[in-house]
Amino acid sequence: MIVAIMVMNAKGVSEVVGTLMAVLITFALVAVVFNFITAATVKNT
C-alpha cells in the first residue's frame, strides 16, 4: 500500500515536472520568436 502511494506520488511529480518543462520550452520559443521579430522590425525601421 505504501509502495503504491509512493509510486503514485512519483508519477504525479514526474507529470508536474514534465508540464513545467513543456511550459518553459514554450516560453523560450516564444521569447526567441519575439526577439527575432523585434530585431527584424528594428532593422526595417
Curated annotation (Swiss-Prot):
Primary localisation category: membrane
- May I have one GO cellular component term? membrane
Respond yes or no to whether keyword Membrane is given for this record.
Answer: yes
Which controlled-vocabulary keywords does the entry list?
Membrane, Transmembrane, Transmembrane helix
Q: Any stretches that span the bilayer, and where are they? A: 15-37
Q: Where in the cell is it found?
A: Membrane
Q: How does it sit in the membrane?
A: Single-pass membrane protein
Lineage: superkingdom: Archaea
Name of the protein this chain belongs to? Uncharacterized protein AF_0369
